């Protein structure tokens, strides 16, 4: 049975500090490194084959992926795609989440953070966290560089990439591993499980805990489950 393995990167330094990260290229925390190694080990222990891998342009996802591949004695060959980057948080980037909630109020905070189609105010070009024009993003067409994104905006880049690049591997019965981010994976799960615009705000993707989706013929989902059961809540996507 063909498998799609989705893993959010291990905890990042800014995750630990409870800050909005987005496209800033922050590193893994010590805990995040451990989570990545544990993800690789559990995949190995369960003898889950990985045929092809994808990740974003951001080091926290790349390092998580390389840790998993090393644990499984696999060649460090993988595909990077900016379309799998985290959602761009605009002017919220770098801010502490609790402090931001107190400043703008809980209702507005929830809209910016969890709504389907509301984006935060755009990041200014002179922001200290502006990374769009760094060499890291040189291959991205200028017109596609976001200064802010809603989850819908993230969905609109993740899903076409899945359809055009990733899906064909699943059709060929290859097991695919994607190491990405909370919101890019939420967007993909919304698509795969047909989650409604209102229910998607309830979906949380934990760091460093691979989610396996098993497909029958014609890519019909048979079952899905987190590998680390000790840290996984019940997964209910069909909403």
Model-found features: residue ranges?
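Acidic, His/Gly-rich catalytic cores of divalent-metal-dependent hydrolytic chemistry
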Residues: 228-239
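Active-site-adjacent alpha-helix immediately C-terminal to a catalytic or transition-state-stabilizing loop
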Residues: 4, 62, 70-72, 145-148, ...
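Phosphate-coordination/substrate-recognition cap region in phosphate-metabolizing enzymes
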Residues: 40-129, 139, 190-212, 238
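Short coil-to-beta-strand
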Residues: 2-11
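Active-site glycine-centered loops adjacent to acidic/histidine catalytic or metal-binding residues
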Residues: 9, 83, 181
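Loop-to-helix element that buttresses phosphate recognition and phosphoryl-transfer chemistry
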Residues: 11-67, 71, 79, 145-160, ...
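Flexible, glycine-rich phosphate/dinucleotide-binding loops
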Residues: 13, 87, 118, 185, ...
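Alpha-helix-centered segments that form part of catalytic cores
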Residues: 117, 122-161
